Protein backbone atom coordinates (compact mmCIF):
# COMPACT_ATOMS: atom_id res chain seq x y z
CA UNK A 1 0.00 0.00 0.00
CA UNK A 2 1.25 3.47 -0.75
CA UNK A 3 -0.66 5.35 1.94
CA UNK A 4 1.27 3.84 4.85
CA UNK A 5 3.14 5.95 7.38
CA UNK A 6 6.77 5.13 8.21
CA UNK A 7 7.51 5.45 11.93
CA UNK A 8 10.84 3.60 11.87
CA UNK A 9 13.10 6.65 12.28
CA UNK A 10 13.90 8.04 14.70
CA UNK A 11 13.14 5.89 17.72
CA UNK A 12 10.53 7.37 19.99
CA UNK A 13 10.53 6.40 23.66
CA UNK A 14 7.44 5.33 25.55
CA UNK A 15 7.72 8.23 27.94
CA UNK A 16 4.28 8.80 29.36
CA UNK A 17 2.34 6.81 31.89
CA UNK A 18 3.13 3.99 34.26
CA UNK A 19 4.45 0.73 32.90
CA UNK A 20 2.93 -2.47 34.21
CA UNK A 21 4.46 -5.79 35.13
CA UNK A 22 2.83 -9.19 35.27
CA UNK A 23 0.79 -9.59 38.44
CA UNK A 24 -0.28 -5.94 38.63
CA UNK A 25 -3.97 -5.15 38.95
CA UNK A 26 -5.23 -3.77 35.65
CA UNK A 27 -6.56 -0.22 35.65
CA UNK A 28 -10.01 0.62 34.35
CA UNK A 29 -9.85 2.57 31.10
CA UNK A 30 -12.25 4.10 28.64
CA UNK A 31 -11.92 4.25 24.85
CA UNK A 32 -14.26 5.12 21.98
CA UNK A 33 -16.07 2.80 19.62
CA UNK A 34 -16.72 3.37 15.92
CA UNK A 35 -19.66 5.65 16.74
CA UNK A 36 -17.64 7.81 19.15
CA UNK A 37 -19.40 6.22 22.12
CA UNK A 38 -17.39 5.48 25.27
CA UNK A 39 -16.56 1.87 26.08
CA UNK A 40 -15.21 1.01 29.53
CA UNK A 41 -12.85 -1.91 30.07
CA UNK A 42 -15.13 -3.04 32.89
CA UNK A 43 -17.58 -4.10 30.18
CA UNK A 44 -15.26 -7.10 29.65
CA UNK A 45 -14.68 -7.94 33.33
CA UNK A 46 -15.86 -11.54 32.98
CA UNK A 47 -13.58 -12.23 30.03
CA UNK A 48 -9.89 -12.64 29.46
CA UNK A 49 -8.74 -9.59 27.48
CA UNK A 50 -5.94 -9.52 24.96
CA UNK A 51 -5.25 -5.83 24.37
CA UNK A 52 -3.36 -5.29 21.13
CA UNK A 53 -1.82 -1.80 21.13
CA UNK A 54 -0.44 -0.09 18.02
CA UNK A 55 0.33 3.41 16.66
CA UNK A 56 -1.85 3.62 13.53
CA UNK A 57 -3.81 1.44 11.14
CA UNK A 58 -2.00 3.28 8.33
CA UNK A 59 1.35 1.60 9.00
CA UNK A 60 2.34 -1.76 7.55
CA UNK A 61 3.36 -3.39 10.84
CA UNK A 62 0.16 -2.23 12.54
CA UNK A 63 -1.86 -3.68 9.69
CA UNK A 64 -0.03 -7.00 10.10
CA UNK A 65 -0.64 -6.93 13.86
CA UNK A 66 -4.37 -6.41 13.41
CA UNK A 67 -4.67 -9.03 10.68
CA UNK A 68 -2.81 -11.59 12.80
CA UNK A 69 -4.88 -10.98 15.94
CA UNK A 70 -8.07 -11.05 13.86
CA UNK A 71 -7.08 -14.49 12.58
CA UNK A 72 -6.13 -15.70 16.08
CA UNK A 73 -9.40 -14.41 17.57
CA UNK A 74 -11.40 -16.87 15.49
CA UNK A 75 -9.52 -19.74 17.20
CA UNK A 76 -9.95 -18.57 20.79
CA UNK A 77 -12.59 -19.53 23.33
CA UNK A 78 -15.66 -17.32 23.64
CA UNK A 79 -14.47 -16.12 27.06
CA UNK A 80 -11.51 -14.36 25.42
CA UNK A 81 -11.91 -10.97 23.77
CA UNK A 82 -9.29 -9.12 21.74
CA UNK A 83 -9.34 -5.33 21.93
CA UNK A 84 -7.29 -3.50 19.33
CA UNK A 85 -6.36 0.04 20.42
CA UNK A 86 -4.79 3.00 18.64
CA UNK A 87 -5.32 6.75 18.56
CA UNK A 88 -6.63 6.67 15.01
CA UNK A 89 -9.99 8.34 14.56
CA UNK A 90 -12.77 5.74 14.68
CA UNK A 91 -13.63 6.58 11.06
CA UNK A 92 -10.14 5.55 9.90
CA UNK A 93 -10.38 2.40 12.00
CA UNK A 94 -13.72 1.51 10.39
CA UNK A 95 -12.27 2.05 6.92
CA UNK A 96 -9.27 -0.16 7.70
CA UNK A 97 -11.40 -2.92 9.25
CA UNK A 98 -13.71 -2.99 6.24
CA UNK A 99 -10.82 -3.08 3.77
CA UNK A 100 -8.95 -5.83 5.65
CA UNK A 101 -12.02 -7.82 6.81
CA UNK A 102 -11.20 -7.28 10.48
CA UNK A 103 -14.30 -8.59 12.23
CA UNK A 104 -13.10 -10.88 15.04
CA UNK A 105 -11.48 -8.21 17.21
CA UNK A 106 -12.99 -5.10 18.76
CA UNK A 107 -11.19 -2.02 17.48
CA UNK A 108 -11.35 1.07 19.68
CA UNK A 109 -9.80 4.52 19.69
CA UNK A 110 -7.88 6.16 22.52
CA UNK A 111 -7.56 9.44 20.63
CA UNK A 112 -9.73 11.64 22.83
CA UNK A 113 -8.12 11.31 26.26
CA UNK A 114 -5.28 8.79 25.83
CA UNK A 115 -6.88 7.14 28.85
CA UNK A 116 -5.54 3.66 28.13
CA UNK A 117 -2.18 4.91 26.87
CA UNK A 118 -1.46 7.04 29.92
CA UNK A 119 -2.64 4.45 32.44
CA UNK A 120 -0.67 1.62 30.83
CA UNK A 121 2.47 3.49 29.74
CA UNK A 122 2.03 3.21 25.97
CA UNK A 123 1.99 6.90 24.95
CA UNK A 124 4.66 8.14 22.54
CA UNK A 125 4.53 11.68 23.84
CA UNK A 126 6.33 13.36 20.92
CA UNK A 127 3.86 11.97 18.41
CA UNK A 128 0.72 11.64 20.56
CA UNK A 129 0.43 8.04 19.39
CA UNK A 130 0.36 4.75 21.23
CA UNK A 131 3.40 2.52 21.11
CA UNK A 132 3.21 -1.11 20.13
CA UNK A 133 2.54 -3.93 22.52
CA UNK A 134 0.22 -6.52 23.98
CA UNK A 135 -1.44 -6.81 27.38
CA UNK A 136 -3.25 -9.92 28.64
CA UNK A 137 -5.65 -9.33 31.54
CA UNK A 138 -7.39 -12.28 33.19
CA UNK A 139 -11.03 -12.39 34.31
CA UNK A 140 -10.03 -11.22 37.78
CA UNK A 141 -8.45 -8.05 36.39
CA UNK A 142 -4.82 -9.10 36.84
CA UNK A 143 -2.20 -8.40 34.17
CA UNK A 144 -0.88 -11.85 33.21
CA UNK A 145 1.32 -10.81 30.28
CA UNK A 146 2.59 -7.50 29.00
CA UNK A 147 4.96 -6.57 26.23
CA UNK A 148 6.16 -3.09 25.38
CA UNK A 149 7.76 -3.46 21.94
CA UNK A 150 10.92 -1.35 22.09
CA UNK A 151 11.41 -1.07 18.31
CA UNK A 152 8.19 0.31 16.87
CA UNK A 153 8.92 -1.32 13.52
CA UNK A 154 8.84 -4.79 15.11
CA UNK A 155 5.76 -6.91 15.62
CA UNK A 156 4.83 -8.07 19.11
CA UNK A 157 5.47 -11.63 20.27
CA UNK A 158 2.09 -13.09 19.34
CA UNK A 159 3.01 -16.59 20.47
CA UNK A 160 3.99 -15.44 23.97
CA UNK A 161 0.74 -13.52 24.41
CA UNK A 162 -1.36 -16.43 23.17
CA UNK A 163 0.57 -18.85 25.39
CA UNK A 164 -0.23 -16.64 28.40
CA UNK A 165 -3.93 -16.87 27.50
CA UNK A 166 -3.81 -20.66 27.11
CA UNK A 167 -2.09 -20.99 30.50
CA UNK A 168 -5.04 -19.28 32.19
CA UNK A 169 -7.21 -22.35 31.59
Language-model features and meaning:
Residues 1-169:
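Chalcogenol-based redox active-site neighborhoods
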Amino acid sequence: KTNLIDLTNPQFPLASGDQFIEGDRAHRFEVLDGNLQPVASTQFKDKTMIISVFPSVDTSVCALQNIRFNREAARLDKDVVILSLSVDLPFAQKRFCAAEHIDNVRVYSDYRDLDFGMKYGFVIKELRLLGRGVVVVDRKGIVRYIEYVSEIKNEPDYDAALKAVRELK
